[in-house]
Amino acid sequence: MNFFGIGLPEMLVILAIALLVFGPKKLPEIGRSLGKALRGFQDASREFESEIKREIDRTPATPAEATVEPPVLDSAPTEAVTVEKQTETQV
């Protein structure tokens, strides 16, 4: 039996020390309050997990980015561009 990484011999030693420190009358009360605290922690963690799952299911998936294609030109520009070669002295 392994509980939180503690084996049976270690658990018996801890129980014996608790019995000596708190006494036999106080141990059931401590066990009850410890059990209630653990149950409350488990309930809160389950509630948190279900809330996260609910939020994930509720949020819509982001739409894929729309691709915009550039317009296709029907023809080349009508204006003619003249290119003259200049020598270094003209520049």
From Swiss-Prot:
<feature type="compositionally biased region" description="Low complexity">
    <location>
        <begin position="59"/>
        <end position="72"/>
    </location>
</feature>
<dbReference type="GO" id="GO:0008320">
    <property type="term" value="F:protein transmembrane transporter activity"/>
</dbReference>
<keyword id="KW-1133">Transmembrane helix</keyword>
<feature type="region of interest" description="Disordered">
    <location>
        <begin position="57"/>
        <end position="91"/>
    </location>
</feature>
<dbReference type="InterPro" id="IPR003369">
    <property type="entry name" value="TatA/B/E"/>
</dbReference>
<keyword id="KW-0812">Transmembrane</keyword>
<protein>
    <recommendedName>
        <fullName>Sec-independent protein translocase protein TatA</fullName>
    </recommendedName>
</protein>
<keyword id="KW-0472">Membrane</keyword>
<dbReference type="Pfam" id="PF02416">
    <property type="entry name" value="TatA_B_E"/>
</dbReference>
<dbReference type="InterPro" id="IPR006312">
    <property type="entry name" value="TatA/E"/>
</dbReference>
<comment type="subunit">
    <text>Forms a complex with TatC.</text>
</comment>
<keyword id="KW-0997">Cell inner membrane</keyword>
<keyword id="KW-0653">Protein transport</keyword>
<keyword id="KW-0811">Translocation</keyword>
<keyword id="KW-0813">Transport</keyword>
<comment type="function">
    <text>Part of the twin-arginine translocation (Tat) system that transports large folded proteins containing a characteristic twin-arginine motif in their signal peptide across membranes. TatA could form the protein-conducting channel of the Tat system.</text>
</comment>
<dbReference type="GO" id="GO:0033281">
    <property type="term" value="C:TAT protein transport complex"/>
</dbReference>
<dbReference type="GO" id="GO:0043953">
    <property type="term" value="P:protein transport by the Tat complex"/>
</dbReference>
<keyword id="KW-1003">Cell membrane</keyword>
<comment type="similarity">
    <text>Belongs to the TatA/E family.</text>
</comment>
<feature type="transmembrane region" description="Helical">
    <location>
        <begin position="3"/>
        <end position="23"/>
    </location>
</feature>
